[in-house]
Structures are given as structure tokens and as C-alpha cells.
Amino acid sequence: MKLNIYIMHSEKIDYKEEIYRPLLEKGLMKDNTLILPLSKKFESTYIKELLISSDIVICDLTKSNIFLKTEIKMANKLNKKIYYFINSNDKNKNKYKDIFEYTNKEDFVNKVDNLINSLNKKELILNRDNIYTLGKLNID
């Protein structure tokens, strides 16, 4: 299944070189649609509209600021599933739980790629024959 993936980040980082370019070069767009909110393609679209059209959100918390926190609140209000990432050198990394740490942009892209692949596999399993396995019933 093709996912619409919203990429959320702070403007305090070089997001074009640290996030956008590496993700595009990895080829995540061939099977999915990346929504890069600060790219020319989406510059005239409201963030809320972009979030509504997304299936999941990838959020890099590195050097987070008030605008990023506002974006996160908006995504939460829209009940979007958010996967959080942070650079292991970020001074605030210990403030967060359930977060993917990365060491450099290659590590970030690989972890995002692995996450997306695992989500796509889960979706394939769930949609196969429209049969959902919720658990096993043990009858003695």
C-alpha cells in the first residue's frame, strides 16, 4: 500500500540537506508519497491540509522549536500516528520516550526506510484476504 508520509522537522536544522535530499535519494518516493512541507511543491498549501492528507507523520525533534511543537499538536488533534526521531547529539534527547535515535543523516534515512518497510509489510498482512487475526483462543 502506498503511504502518504508527512515529514515534520524544525527549521533550525539544514532540513534540505539533512532530511529532504537524503530521503529523496533513498527512493522512498517510488513506493510512497513524501509530503515535504517546506518544499516548493507544498509552499502554498496550509500545513493542516497536508497533515489531513497524510497517513503517518515522521517527526525529527532535533533542535525543536515552538513551530514544530505547534505542528505536533495539530497532528495529534487530527489523530495522526507520529513516529519520533532525534539526533543522538541533541541535548534534549533524554526528554523523550519511544523515540528513534540516529547518529547521522544516513542512519536517519535507513531507520525511516526500515520503519516504512515494516509498516508496509504489516499493511499487506492485514489486508491479505481481509482476514484479521487478533489473537489465539486457548480452549482447554
Regions found by a protein language model. Give the residues of each.
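Conserved catalytic or regulatory cores that recognize and/or transform ribose-phosphate-containing ligands
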Residues: 1-140
